[in-house]
Every structure is written in C-alpha cells, then in structure tokens.
Amino acid sequence: MSHPSPQAKPSNPSNPRVFFDVDIGGERVGRIVLELFADIVPKTAENFRALCTGEKGIGHTTGKPLHFKGCPFHRIIKKFMIQGGDFSNQNGTGGESIYGEKFEDENFHYKHDREGLLSMANAGRNTNGSQFFITTVPTPHLDGKHVVFGQVIKGIGVARILENVEVKGEKPAKLCVIAECGELKEGDDGGIFPKDGSGDSHPDFPEDADIDLKDVDKILLITEDLKNIGNTFFKSQNWEMAIKKYAEVLRYVDSSKAVIETADRAKLQPIALSCVLNIGACKLKMSNWQGAIDSCLEALELDPSNTKALYRRAQGWQGLKEYDQALADLKKAQGIAPEDKAIQAELLKVKQKIKAQKDKEKAVYAKMFA
C-alpha cells in the first residue's frame, strides 16, 4: 500500500542531499537540490546519489562514466514531468544503474501525489537503470508502477522553468543539461544564494526564500534591493547581469501576486513595469531587437500608454528595419506626450529613414526600366 508523500523538506535530516546545476541553451538557470529517501528506499537512493557524484567509475554495459554530469533532460511534458538520466545515449534509450544494467523495484511506499517528487523511469517492472523524472503535477496513474525515491527541497522554480521550455514533440528545442552535480554535505547551504559578487543576498527563486510572499512590504524591500543591483550592472554596461537581476525581481513579483489580494497587486506594478522596461533597454544595447520588442510589449500589457515602452519598441523596429512599425509606435507616443523632445527627434529620424528607403527603391526601379 502506498502512502502520501512527505510534506516536510527534508523529510529526514539524515537523508542524503544532492544537487543539479542546470543549463538551458548554454546559460546557467539555477540549482535543484534533492533529498533522497534513503530511509525508505536505500538501494534506489544510493544508485542516484552515486550517479550524482560519479564515484563508481565506468559502467559495465554502457562503457560510459556512471555520472549525470553533462546529461540532458531529454523528455519534457508540461503539466506532467521532466525526465533525464540517460547519460549514454542521451535520448531515453540508454543509461545504466551502479548495480548493472537494471535493478528491481525496491518498493512503492510513496504516492506520486504532488509536484517536485523524484521517481524512477522504467520500461516495465524491475527495469530501473539511471533514468529518472521529476513530477510537475500529481501523477496518481504512476503509483505502484514507478518508485518514488526523493523530492525537490530547493529549486522548484528551476524545475518549473524546465517544464515550460519550448519543445518539439517531447524533446526540448534548446539543450537542457545537468552541467554540474554532486552531493551536499552537512552544513552546506545548498548553493541557492547567488555567488556573483553583486551583493545579492536573496535566493534566485522566491520559492527558496524564507519569506512570507503575502507580505507585500517585505517583497517591495527585496525587489527594490534587487533592482538597485541590476541598475549598478546597467551603469557598468554589464547587460546580461542586469537582465538577470531584473528578471529575479519579476520572479519575486509574480510569486507574490499569485498569493495576495487583487487590491495589493497594484503596489507591485510600478517596480515590475520599471524592470520590464529596463530589460528592454538592455536588449536594445545588445542589439537583440526582437527581444527588446517583446519586452516592450510586456510593458505595454502592464501600461498601454507607456511612452518609454513605445519609444523603445520603435527603436527595436528600427533595428529590424521595420520603419513603418516604428513610425506607428512613435506617432502613438507623440499623441500621449506631444512635448517630449526625444520622441520628436526619433520621429524625425524614422521619417528620414523611410524617405531614404523609398529613394533607394526608386533608384533601383529607374535602373531596371532605363
């Protein structure tokens, strides 16, 4: 008979803790920290722990290192699970346990009754190897068929980012990989706090912070601190780090908005809008024109008459040589702020570009029919 999964994190302080540092498309997203239920399924837990450390050397059946480092999440299904652990073929057809190719189902003590449970992938009864999955919703149809052997205790936000990556079928469009992995020792903080020298003392993901997300005043203090760190990076022209900090602000805002009353959400809008606009400005500096346009659209969803968003989106359109789109945004901005000198100057510049483009086209046609 299966039992409800433990609610405490960790469920047993003596259980081993392991970690994955996850990269998506070559960029570090964050860390997932997992508790392994060695008190309930010791053989299954030991298999996974050793695959995280790589201490067992080369596998007998695969001829590959028994190690998750460099292993992709090869299968992702939204509102279901994220799957990885095929370190040999990297597509779901391979892998190997530390005990040999396969080992038996140890027990089905825990149910798949919530998000963030770690369970063994298999090809039927008693076919456990190295492949695993992390649930992103309750999956009761897997009870009695797959062995639950751990849980996410930190980094569920990283798992959610993985869950929501673009996929082709069930395969991520960008490579989602376990860049680093290992075992955490007693006293380790789990590595969830930024180590980027920025002075950021807040976990990257609000789910890992020991705060009440309903405390809007506390959230405002945290997000203002993070925004200021982002601004410092912006001033030093470190656009990527600035974006990272502004995005962290938005994660805290979104997590708080999800649990607070509607009336309180308005208090968080100004800082959210400011950071979305700043992300757009960073992307313009990086010549990421489409990214800047997308950020400005997000800002306009928060404030449809925001002239900064219209102005910056017009700059993005110009980067793509979509001058008519730029002209439309600037005319709308001018209608809202007719005295704004910067908008007037940009409008003149775009009109000149449109004229130059038309003159060039006329010259081409003239040569064609000469």
Swiss-Prot record:
Per the record, the GO terms for biological process are: apoptotic process; cellular response to UV-A; chaperone-mediated protein folding; lipid droplet organization; negative regulation of transcription by RNA polymerase II; positive regulation of apoptotic process; positive regulation of protein secretion; positive regulation of viral genome replication
Transport as a keyword?
yes
**Mutagenesis / variant outcome for changing residue 227 to A:** Abolishes interaction with HSP90AB1 and impairs interaction with HSPA8
Q: In terms of domain of life, where is this protein from?
A: Eukaryota
Subcellular location as annotated: Cytoplasm; Nucleus, Nucleolus; Nucleus, Nucleoplasm
Q: Which residues carry this modification: Phosphoserine?
A: 5, 198
Effect on the protein upon substituting residue 284 to A: Impairs interaction with HSP90AB1 and HSPA8
The main enzyme category here is isomerase
What changing residue 329 to A does, per the record, is: Impairs interaction with HSP90AB1
Sites where N6-acetyllysine occurs are at: 171
Check the record and name the Pfam families matching this protein: Pro_isomerase
List the keywords (alphabetical): Acetylation, Apoptosis, Chaperone, Cytoplasm, Host-virus interaction, Isomerase, Nucleus, Phosphoprotein, Protein transport, Repeat, Rotamase, TPR repeat, Transport
Q: Which Gene3D superfamilies match?
A: Cyclophilin-like, Tetratricopeptide repeat domain
What's the main place this protein lives? Answer: cytoplasm
The EC designation for this entry is 5.2.1.8
Q: How is its activity regulated?
A: Less sensitive to inhibition by cyclosporin A than is CYP-18.
| Stretches for region Chaperone activity | 185-215
Catalytic activity from the UniProt record: [protein]-peptidylproline (omega=180) = [protein]-peptidylproline (omega=0)
GO CC term (a single one): nucleolus
An MF annotation (GO) of this entry? cyclosporin A binding
- Which family does this protein fall into? Belongs to the cyclophilin-type PPIase family. PPIase D subfamily.
Purpose of the protein: PPIase that catalyzes the cis-trans isomerization of proline imidic peptide bonds in oligopeptides and may therefore assist protein folding. Proposed to act as a co-chaperone in HSP90 complexes such as in unligated steroid receptors heterocomplexes. Different co-chaperones seem to compete for association with HSP90 thus establishing distinct HSP90-co-chaperone-receptor complexes with the potential to exert tissue-specific receptor activity control. May have a preference for estrogen receptor complexes and is not found in glucocorticoid receptor complexes. (Microbial infection) May be involved in hepatitis C virus (HCV) replication and release.
Annotated protein name in UniProt = Peptidyl-prolyl cis-trans isomerase D
Q: Which organism is it from?
A: Homo sapiens
